[in-house]
Regions:
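Extended soluble regions of mature proteins
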Residues: 21-271
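Bacterial Sec-dependent N-terminal signal peptides
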Residues: 1-28, 271
Length: 271
């Protein structure tokens, strides 16, 4: 009987060790839809093309998801870019944040380190999975067979009209994911998770994330550390701060209306 207990203990220990050792690194590339409108007495189609191209390059980013069965870290890969020469008197430089998204599936929580308007925040909250609708469709992404899942909701945004007025827009949104049961973890890039396999592709109509490389059980053990720097807030508190700051910026823009000599470039990210 004692021998049986010892064997059972060893088997349990080995099983736990195997489960904990499963880990990997997935690389994703992003593309974002940009709706560009130019409000000017002398609309310049060539300038519009140049802005569109600069924005396209700015939004092409690379991210890594480092994961094990219980935790993950998702962050943008830093890369050195040669300075872009100003064209037609302008150059676009979009500030790319150093966001780090930590998810703990076992404890059902996440921590998101993010920066807005020069201030660092640490968003801590409970994971809130969407009610995904599993669809009987498949496709291959690299060497993996992926299955489709969709989620429908509404998104509300504030924007400035061509007249400089603040407009609130609510529109339907469909998010489509592709996940593979061949990598049996319920995780994915950014805030996405909750499907029976690693999520390899995301498309919400504006943003597309596609996995381009996966390393399972790399030789060097992966490091997953929860971020700790920043002002700690909940997700709701952060969104309230973000909305307030965005509204303040739009109001400042409104106050300068009429002093832009009739030339204004309006860039809307998304549809």
């Amino acid at each position: 009987m004692k021998i049986n207990y010892v064997c059972f203990f060893l088997l349990l220990t080995i099983s736990n060790a195997i489960a904990q050792e499963f880990q990997g690194i997935a690389t994703y590339k992003s593309h974002r839809k940009v709706d560009l409108k130019i409000s000017s007495e002398n609309e310049n189609s060539e300038m519009k093309k140049q802005i569109q191209e600069q924005l396209r390059k700015q939004f092409q980013q690379e991210y890594t998801l480092t994961f094990n069965r219980n935790e993950s870290i998702y962050k943008r890969e830093e890369k050195l870019q040669a300075p872009q020469p100003a064209q037609s008197g302008f150059r676009i430089q979009i500030a790319q944040g150093s966001d780090i998204m930590y998810k703990n599936m076992k404890e059902n929580r996440y921590t998101n380190k993010t920066e807005i308007f020069g201030k660092l925040f640490l968003i801590k909250d409970t994971l809130n999975n969407r009610q995904w609708q599993l669809v009987n469709e498949t496709k291959n992404i690299g060497d993996y067979t992926c299955f489709k899942a969709v989620f429908n909701d509404e998104i509300t945004t504030q924007t400035l009209t061509e007249e400089g007025e603040i407009e609130t827009i609510t529109k339907p949104r469909t998010t489509t994911l592709w996940y593979t049961p061949q990598i049996p973890i319920n995780n994915g890039p950014a805030e996405y998770y909750g499907l029976p396999g690693l999520i390899l592709e995301v498309n919400d109509g504006d943003l597309t994330l596609v996995c381009t490389k996966i390393i399972i059980n790399p030789e060097e053990r992966v490091s997953i550390e929860e971020p700790t720097k920043g002002k700690e807030v909940s997700q709701v508190e952060f969104e309230e701060i973000q909305d307030k700051k965005s509204k303040e910026m739009m109001e400042q823009y409104q106050s300068r209306k009429g002093n832009d000599d009739g030339n204004r470039v309006m860039i809307r990210i998304g549809g």
